[in-house]
Amino acid sequence: MTDYLLLFVGTVLVNNFVLVKFLGLCPFMGVSKKLETAMGMGLATTFVMTLASICAWLIDTWILIPLNLIYLRTLAFILVIAVVVQFTEMVVRKTSPVLYRLLGIFLPLITTNCAVLGVALLNINLGHNFLQSALYGFSAAVGFSLVMVLFAAIRERLAVANVPAPFRGNAIALITAGLMSLAFMGFSGLVKL
């Protein structure tokens, strides 16, 4: 049980996918201008990343390795992610039309999020079992969502702040992301993986 807790804390805080591994920077910078959109993208990404990690592990373990098709791993995982995103879109559309309208634009964007593919590939490279793969995918998504929501809240405050002209827009956003990355480096001694 302690190993799973360490995996969760290590993935969310110490080895954050956005601030440490630099995966998922496109939605991190693009969707984080408003807190509501960042929260919606975070929820959708959490669901997709967790489910894609599980499906990718199952396909790799039950199909690719037994048939010696490991060279198709990246292509297979991209297809798995696309199918999971489409499945998620269909389920959300049928079960909650309000949530579908809220997340409508974000669901197709998750297909191109490199963090989702990165989690699936890292699960295999790190030799995780089924439970570890599911937890790693969920933890990476929680870390992604946490950082994106924090960044969106900071950007909303910066939008009304008196920022010097050369630093307005993307410049102050990149400086803020760098400072957040430095702040998360403070967690580096917390867990040794």
Swiss-Prot record:
The keyword Cell cycle does not apply. It is a multi-pass membrane protein. Keywords: Cell inner membrane, Cell membrane, Electron transport, Membrane, Translocase, Transmembrane, Transmembrane helix, Transport. It is an enzyme of class 7 (translocase). GO terms for biological process: electron transport chain. The keyword Cell membrane applies. The chain crosses the membrane at residues 5-25, 39-59, 63-83, 102-122, 134-154, 171-191. GO terms for cellular component: plasma membrane. It comes from the Bacteria. InterPro entries: Ion_transpt_RnfA/RsxA, NqrDE/RnfAE, NqrDE/RnfAE_oxidrdctase. It is found in: Cell inner membrane. Its main location: membrane. Part of a membrane-bound complex that couples electron transfer with translocation of ions across the membrane. Required to maintain the reduced state of SoxR. The complex is composed of six subunits: RsxA, RsxB, RsxC, RsxD, RsxE and RsxG. Belongs to the NqrDE/RnfAE family. This is Ion-translocating oxidoreductase complex subunit A. It comes from Escherichia fergusonii (strain ATCC 35469 / DSM 13698 / CCUG 18766 / IAM 14443 / JCM 21226 / LMG 7866 / NBRC 102419 / NCTC 12128 / CDC 0568-73). The gene is rsxA.
